[in-house]
A protein has these predicted regions:
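Residues on the lipid-exposed face of transmembrane beta-strands in outer-membrane beta-barrel proteins
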Residues: 51-55, 81-89, 101-103, 148-154, ...
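Repeated loop/turn-to-beta-strand initiation elements of outer-membrane beta-barrel proteins
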Residues: 94-97, 159-161, 226-232
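Short glycine/proline- and aromatic-enriched beta-strand/turn motifs that initiate or cap beta-hairpins
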Residues: 6-87, 265
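Short connector loops at helix/strand junctions that flank enzyme active sites
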Residues: 78-82, 92-96, 143-147, 158
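Extracellular/periplasm-exposed beta-strand and loop segments of Gram-negative cell-envelope proteins
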Residues: 59-78, 106-144, 172-213, 217, ...
């Protein structure tokens, strides 16, 4: 975390002072009474531990947007939260690493108009059809993950600022991807097939969601007040939320989320 090296230096000064003079006055960066000698010794070894929480904003998106998605009528990011614990290790006054364990939710709800959008639907009477859908499609995605980011950190000459970057690895605990279509038609069995008018039909691809995901995380932290830090990150998935052999949706959907939160450095 920002200022780890600076805190270690302050801790050294304080320990030397207490050993020689018995004066337990602490420097500003480690004055909090909850910090005991073990925490200070951990700082001397370059380790710090933080816990934090925050919000995630984003969605699962194709890159680039395909021609089959003609118009996005609405987008709802839903309420996505995260809780995280992070261990920080400094190697030099500037460079270090961060290893985290994050419990997070990701989701979105979209309403779009599409043309020849390949998918499989189930009509209200139970009939199953697959092909190119033309018309409105409403999608809701919601999943819970355990995520491990492994980051390199850099602290600026002003130790209140730090940036970080590195890979993350996520395991999905549970997830849903479903929705419905209405007032359109589907060309079946493919985009060149016969038109079939559809008033309302549903789809559910929850069982096809990928269990393991990975990507890149970049971000920064600001030391706002004593032990309180403000954090902002961008997580960009490098594999889609569906496995590559899932062809019902003909393009990959990458999880792309920005996070904003706070953490407390012990």
């Amino acid at each position: 975390m920002t200022g780890v090296s600076a805190q270690a230096a302050d801790a050294t000064t304080w320990l030397e002072s207490t050993e020689t003079t018995g004066n337990a006055d602490r420097p500003d960066t480690i004055r909090d009474s909850s910090n005991d000698r073990n925490i200070i010794l951990a700082a001397l070894k370059g380790w710090q531990v933080a816990v934090g929480a925050g919000l995630e904003l984003g969605g699962a998106s194709p890159v680039p947007i395909p021609r089959s998605i003609r118009k996005i009528n609405s987008f709802n990011p839903l309420l996505n939260l995260y809780l995280e614990g992070t261990a920080y290790k400094s190697f030099t006054p500037r460079w270090g690493m961060a290893l985290g364990l994050r419990f997070e939710t990701k989701g979105m709800k979209t309403n779009a108009n599409v043309k020849n959008y390949h998918m499989a639907i189930i009509e209200d009477d139970g009939g199953h059809m697959e092909g190119g859908w033309n018309g409105p499609v409403i999608t809701k995605y919601r999943a819970t993950y355990i995520t491990v980011p492994v980051l390199a950190t850099y602290t600026f000459s002003n130790p209140r600022w730090m940036v970080s970057a590195g890979p993350y690895f996520s395991l999905m605990l549970n997830g849903d991807f479903d929705g419905y279509v209405h007032d359109g038609y589907i060309r079946t069995p493919d985009e060149l097939g016969e038109n079939v008018n559809v008033t309302h039909a549903t789809y559910d691809f929850s069982n096809n969601l990928r269990k393991f995901q990975w990507g890149l995380q970049v971000g920064g932290s600001f030391h706002a007040y004593k032990h309180l830090y403000v954090n902002a990150n961008l997580d960009w998935g490098l594999n889609g939320i569906f496995p590559s052999d899932f062809k019902t949706i003909s393009f990959a959907l990458y999880p792309i989320y920005g996070t904003l939160g706070f953490s407390y450095l012990f």
